[in-house]
Amino acid sequence: MDKYKIADRRLEVAASFGRRGARVADIGTDHASLPIYLVGNGIAPCALACDINEGPLRAAKLNIASAELTDRIDTCLTDGLNGIDGYGPEDIYILGMGGELISRIVLSSRLSKKEGVRLILQPMTHAHDLRRDLFASGFDIVDEALVRDRDRVYQIIVAEYDGIIRTATQVELWLGKENIERGGADLRDLASLYAFGLGKKIKGYAEAGKTDEQANELFCELKRLAETVN
């Protein structure tokens, strides 16, 4: 049984993709909840809790001290991955941000492309843009998952750099190829949510006398998944 608990199901599933023994960096740390869980339970030997703002770092420091892990978890005031190369992180978590921001953080740093580095990403929005940018920049999505937490379905994307440029269908970018292959209620509900939003957008196009064939095709595929996945 884990000594240190994590209340957030989203963070718990993200943590499950970490590799035992890997040095961790948590970018945009959430009160250091994830580093405390990983280090406190012996999954990671040490961790770096990072944030661009002082407030979250102050809260993180208090929680780290309360957990008696100040000798194994450090904090860092930084923008994205800037300035943490010397720490040598192997598993980098970037959770709870917009997909476009995550993409900017990942692609603007050479650290993310270093051999042996794994990225565990959880976009709140624009997961399709994040996947597209990863594939176009030589990253492989080695695993992914859908997780339901507080009546919302989140996407978790695990990526590693190998320099190979990849492509994917529109629906694979939106939902993830492995998630589609697995199926399940979470996939069905997420496809339904995306289809609803895209349907409103298509209706707006029609009212303006415009059409978007790519959007129409994606809408049909999302709707099909929403109606047929068990």
Describe the residue ranges of each PLM region.
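S-adenosyl-L-methionine
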Residues: M1-G21, I36, R58-Y87
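Conserved SAM-binding loop of SAM-dependent methyltransferases across substrates and taxa
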Residues: H31-A44
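Conserved class I S-adenosyl-L-methionine
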Residues: G21-D30
